[in-house]
């Protein structure tokens, strides 16, 4: 397999830490928290190591974003749970963390003719309107992801549930492009 410099850019994960979470108390007691209920119903907590941001909702749902790996997302959630326990908020000790989305970047290392690719890959799974957006949008079923392909050969893979989904998508696309003689 060729090295396409696949890099995880963002992991979005969610969990349930309890119910009836007192966001006002968290806002008062954790100085770096952000809570503006008139603008948005969630409270923002940030972790420094690993670097991540978490939206905490009164319902107990937590959405963690900004991690560079699934493990970092889990570590960030653990830190959030610890922070909340320290100020007396009743939360689940080890909540189940579920990956919702992984965004990865990759580089095929060659310039691409997106017009030829749009025709070659078949228009049913492709959106390409260069006047609207410079990238070609390719929807894959297996793995179930959306890939943005740019003329520079760079790609963004989104919608995956594991790092493996990004790797499979990049390998599949590079193989399809090679088979079509477009790479």
Swiss-Prot record:
Superkingdom, natural source: Archaea
Cited function: General factor that plays a role in the activation of archaeal genes transcribed by RNA polymerase. Binds specifically to the TATA box promoter element which lies close to the position of transcription initiation.
Ranges of the Sequence repeats in the UniProt entry: 8-84, 99-177
Family, per entry: Belongs to the TBP family.
The organism of origin for this protein: Archaeoglobus fulgidus (strain ATCC 49558 / DSM 4304 / JCM 9628 / NBRC 100126 / VC-16)
Gene: tbp
Protein name as annotated: TATA-box-binding protein
Protein's GO biological process: DNA-templated transcription initiation
Keyword field: DNA-binding, Repeat, Transcription, Transcription regulation
Coiled coil: none
GO MF, one example: DNA-binding transcription factor activity
NCBIfam families: PRK00394.1-2, PRK00394.2-2
Pfam hit, one: TBP
């Amino acid at each position: 397999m060729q090295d396409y410099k696949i890099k995880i850019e963002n992991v979005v994960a969610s969990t349930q830490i309890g119910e009836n979470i007192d966001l006002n108390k968290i806002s008062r007691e954790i100085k770096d928290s952000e809570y503006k209920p008139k603008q948005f119903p969630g409270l923002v907590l940030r972790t420094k190591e690993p670097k991540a941001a978490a939206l905490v909702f009164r319902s107990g749902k937590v959405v963690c974003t900004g991690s560079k790996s699934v493990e970092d997302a889990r570590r960030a959630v653990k830190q959030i749970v610890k922070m909340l326990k320290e100020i007396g908020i009743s939360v689940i000790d080890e909540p189940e963390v579920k990956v919702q989305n992984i965004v990865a970047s990759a580089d095929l290392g060659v310039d691409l003719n997106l017009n030829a690719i749009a025709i070659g890959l078949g228009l049913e799974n492709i959106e390409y309107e260069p006047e609207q957006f410079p990238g070609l949008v390719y929807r894959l079923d297996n793995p179930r992801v959306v890939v943005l392909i740019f003329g520079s050969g760079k790609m963004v893979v989104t919608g995956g549930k594991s790092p493996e989904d990004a790797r499979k998508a990049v390998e599949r696309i590079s193989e399809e492009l090679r088979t079509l003689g477009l790479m």
